[in-house]
UniProtKB/Swiss-Prot annotation:
It comes from Yersinia pseudotuberculosis serotype O:3 (strain YPIII). Its EC number is 2.1.2.3, 3.5.4.10. This is Bifunctional purine biosynthesis protein PurH. The keyword DNA repair does not apply. It catalyses: (6R)-10-formyltetrahydrofolate + 5-amino-1-(5-phospho-beta-D-ribosyl)imidazole-4-carboxamide = 5-formamido-1-(5-phospho-D-ribosyl)imidazole-4-carboxamide + (6S)-5,6,7,8-tetrahydrofolate; IMP + H2O = 5-formamido-1-(5-phospho-D-ribosyl)imidazole-4-carboxamide. Belongs to the PurH family.
Length: 529
């Protein structure tokens, strides 16, 4: 197999015009003939480039409003023709070899994302000729290069210059794989969209699938291989969404430290998503995917100091997330006090980074400042299937709350209730959070009975000498019995925030009234499993 193939003729037909003029200029300057279609050809001609319209080359005009323009033997024969094997038949029919194909596809995803997108709009944005050329060129990568990403343009020009106008086989093979990934993702988007408009294969086969398609096609890009998974006997890798915009562990930049482990990534995600809930300077410390300390402060140093107080024992070897720039004072407080696996913040000051350099094993990440959260899907693998749901982006405000007890909460109790409600959303169910003055003082996570989560939160507070009396308590789901309220009253809780909705709500409210506890219903649950 010939390793290098000279590039003499290029076919360019792109929907995304970014960088195409500069790339075509570079090709033309290197003596490469340019073929093009429709809007791409007009753009290149307007830029003064010598370009031949595909319709002039084939002798067959574009037709049907552009639906048919490249579906012609002189195009696909030039792409699929095997050099040294099909030369005779190509010459017989006047087919010129095409050495590089530059194509990206109609913007189907952007079209169907529009609220006013009609079925006709969606259909007209299904690319036919583009994917056909992409797959043809990728199949014949032995002889032809296929380019589907504008980010590859500079590297291709560099390789042409370094190889006397040729591209090597490893480059063509890699480009072909990118092309197959591209068309697979494109077809997946189309199938997912139309799959919501037809009945599912199982269940109610009379109604359209609706929000979730009847066949779910997912495309993720591998970011890194892990040393191992959750445990050392499990292999693992980290895959990310393409073009994700939201600040996240997937988009974060690592400034120092060892490679992130599987558990590091999972815990960092939990910490970062929790700290995003707060607008004031906040710190979240996570251990084994559960917050073990959360606080708001006048500064991130104050927030860290208060979050650490909740549970210093569990904070050892934890993940720390901030919603403000990490400064030197806070960085120094962390590394002088505790062992930490990961620190993540929107940005890190140069002084803080210089201090952290003394602890090279500490993984330091920046994620950029975030705006509004993006809607999306969450997945949970079960044996033989996949559970899919919308991301839990729900959160109540003071205006959404219902006070159901005889006593009204004070302003401070209301602030503390909303604070610990935000934290409870990120604690594994059954989740109980005690908080006072915008600081967690006890967290009970993952217990099979809610009353034991309440008891554990009280034990945690007592172990650290934190005063519970006058604190608020949040529960991620309703109290099925009054025992959780009795346990809270026994340690001095004066305000409880919970979803409500139990068949025994009246008994639970009566228990709150007996103890003089203010009880707030959110009418929103935050199970987390």
């Amino acid at each position: 197999m010939q390793q290098r193939r000279p590039i003499r003729r290029a076919l360019l037909s792109v929907s995304d015009k970014a960088g195409i003029i500069e790339f075509a200029q570079a090709l033309s300057q290197r003596g490469i003939e340019l073929l093009s279609t429709g809007g791409t050809a007009r753009l290149l001609a307007d830029a003064g480039l010598p370009v031949t319209e595909v319709s002039d080359y084939t002798g067959f005009p574009e037709m049907m409003d552009g639906r048919v323009k490249t579906l012609h033997p002189k195009v696909h024969g030039g792409i699929l023709g095997r050099r040294g094997q099909d030369d005779g038949i190509m010459a017989q029919h006047g087919i010129q070899p095409i050495d590089i194909v530059v194509v990206n596809l109609y913007p189907f995803a952007q079209t169907v994302a529009r609220p006013d997108c009609s079925l006709e709009d969606a259909v007209e944005n299904i690319d036919i000729g583009g994917p056909t050329m992409v797959r043809s060129a990728a199949k014949n990568h032995k002889d032809v290069a296929i380019v589907v990403k504008s980010s590859d343009y500079p590297a291709i020009i560099t390789e042409l210059d370094n190889n006397d106008g040729s591209l090597t086989y490893p480059t063509r093979f890699n480009l072909a794989i990118k092309a197959f990934e591209h068309t697979a993702a494109y077809d997946s988007m189309i199938a997912n969209y139309f799959g919501t408009l037809v009945p599912p294969y199982h269940g109610d086969t009379e109604q359209p699938s609706g929000h979730f398609p009847r066949t779910l096609n997912l495309n993720y890009i591998k970011k890194q291989d892990m040393r191992y998974g959750e445990n050392s006997h499990q292999q693992a890798a980290f895959y990310i969404e393409e073009d994700v915009k939201e600040a996240s562990v997937a988009t974060a930049q690592q400034l120092q430290g060892k490679a992130l482990s599987y558990n590091n990534i999972a815990d960092t995600d939990a910490a970062l998503e929790c700290v995003k809930e707060f607008s004031e300077p906040a710190c979240v410390i996570v251990k084994h995917a559960n917050p073990c300390g959360v606080a708001i402060g006048d500064s991130i140093l104050a927030a860290y100091e208060r979050a650490y107080q909740t549970d210093p024992t569990s904070a050892f070897g934890g993940i720390i997330a901030f919603n403000r720039e990490l400064d030197a004072a806070t960085a120094n407080a962390i590394i002088s006090r505790q062992f930490v696996e990961v620190i993540i913040a929107p940005t890190v000051s140069s002084d803080a980074l210089a201090l952290l350099a003394a602890k090279q094993n500490v993984r330091v990440l920046t994620c950029g400042q975030w705006q509004a959260r993006s809607a999306g899907l969450d997945f949970k693998r079960v044996n033989g299937g996949l559970l899919v749901q919308e991301r839990d982006l729900g959160m109540v405000t003071a205006a959404d709350l219902r006070v159901v007890s005889k006593r009204q909460p004070t302003e401070q109790e209301l602030r503390d209730a909303l604070f610990c409600w935000k934290v409870a959303k990120f604690v594994k169910s059954n989740a109980i959070v005690y908080a006072r003055d915008n600081m967690t003082i006890g967290i009970g996570a993952g217990q099979m009975s809610r009353v034991y989560s309440a008891k554990i939160a009280g034990i945690k507070a007592a172990d650290e000498g934190l005063e519970v009396a006058g604190s608020a308590m949040a529960s991620d789901a309703f109290f099925p019995f009054r025992d959780g309220i009795d346990a809270a009253a026994a340690v001095g809780i004066t305000c409880v925030i919970q979803p409500g909705g139990s068949i025994r709500d009246d008994e639970v409210i009566a228990a709150a009234d007996e103890h003089g506890i203010a009880m707030i219903f959110t009418d929103m649950r935050h199970f987390r499993h």
